[in-house]
Design a protein with these regions (language model features):
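Residue-level detector of alpha-helix initiation sites
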Residues: 10-11, 36, 109-111, 131, ...
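Beta1-alpha1 glycine-rich phosphate/pyrophosphate-binding loop at the start
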Residues: 2-72, 161-182
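FAD-binding core/adjacent interface of flavoenzyme oxidoreductases
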Residues: 1-5, 60-147, 221-227, 231-237, ...
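Rossmann-like dinucleotide-binding cores of NAD(P)H-dependent redox enzymes
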Residues: 59, 145, 154-212
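Short glycine/serine/threonine-rich phosphate/pyrophosphate-binding segments
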Residues: 13-16, 107, 155-158
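A general structural signal for well-ordered alpha-helical segments in protein cores
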Residues: 13, 42, 63, 113, ...
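A conserved short coil-to-beta-strand element within the FAD-binding core of flavoproteins
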Residues: 76-87, 204-216
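Generic structural signal for residues in well-ordered beta-strands
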Residues: 29, 72-74, 124, 169, ...
Length: 249
């Protein structure tokens, strides 16, 4: 019997596999993931500095442990490049072809990356999974000043976390207040006040148009041509659902 294939080992993918195994212990089950397949709680990514936890400490179980618990095969560091719904096959980025009985796409979303000019864009990080968090945590070691692009939910969560971790944080938000699309003005004002009490500096109005290197530091260039000094930058301006492969199927 061809397996059920779940693409994605995040909260949705692993929870689906756990619930399915409560109903059926025998059906072949395979999970595919673009990362290392560790099980973790994604909301914890924006609490790691407050709790002083590394990526390894945020992980709940590795892929081998999850495979054993779920009686499943887990393929790590692979991506689906094409789906043939008529043949019920997947083509992976390594050229492998897999046949499925049923297919579940639980692969989440990609970060939206703004078009930025300058030679410092390689110091702009997005944190969307545990490997991203690990890379950022290693990169920020020994640094002090963080500029966050975006004052929405993720931007404010990281501003809070990094401030608690002892970093100086500036947040650039063009729309004039934190969480502008999620909260009414009184609640937004309360969030702003609480974060400013932690030392967070909000810069409302202009957007970020570039990041330039200035020796060992960075200069974040805003649309009004003002500049903000930084050691490292986080882009937190939103996510886009991963739908292109499914649309092409």
């Amino acid at each position: 019997m061809d397996p059920i294939i779940i693409v994605g080992t995040g909260l949705a993918g692993y929870n689906l596999a756990k619930e399915y195994r409560k109903l059926n212990q025998e059906r072949p089950l395979m999970l595919l993931t673009a990362d290392d397949g560790r099980n973790y709680s994604k909301p914890m990514l924006s609490t790691g500095f407050t709790k002083q936890k590394s990526a390894d400490e945020l992980a709940l179980a590795d892929a081998a442990t999850m495979a054993q618990q779920l009686k499943a095969e887990i393929k790590t560091f692979v991506q689906v490049s094409a789906i043939d719904t008529a043949a019920r096959t997947l083509t992976l980025n390594n050229g492998e072809t897999l046949t499925y009985g049923e297919l579940v796409l639980a692969w989440g979303a990609d970060v939206f990356r703004p078009p930025l000019a300058g030679d410092g864009v390689d110091q702009v990080y997005s944190i969307n999974d545990l490997l991203d968090y690990d890379r950022f945590r290693k990169a920020v070691e020994g640094k002090q000043k963080v500029v966050i692009i975006g004052g929405g939910l993720i931007g404010c969560e990281f501003a809070n976390d990094l401030s608690n971790g002892g970093f100086q944080v500036d947040v650039v938000e063009p729309l004039g207040r934190p969480l502008p699309t999620l909260l009414p003005e009184p609640a937004s004002a309360a969030v702003r006040e609480a974060l400013e009490e932690l030392g967070v500096v909000f810069r409302f109005g202009p957007h970020v148009k570039g990041v330039e290197k200035r020796g060992a530091s960075l200069s974040v260039v805003l649309s009004d041509d003002s500049r903000v000094a930084a050691d490292i930058v986080i882009s937190a301006i939103g996510l886009r659902p991963r739908i292109q492969v499914a649309k092409d199927a």
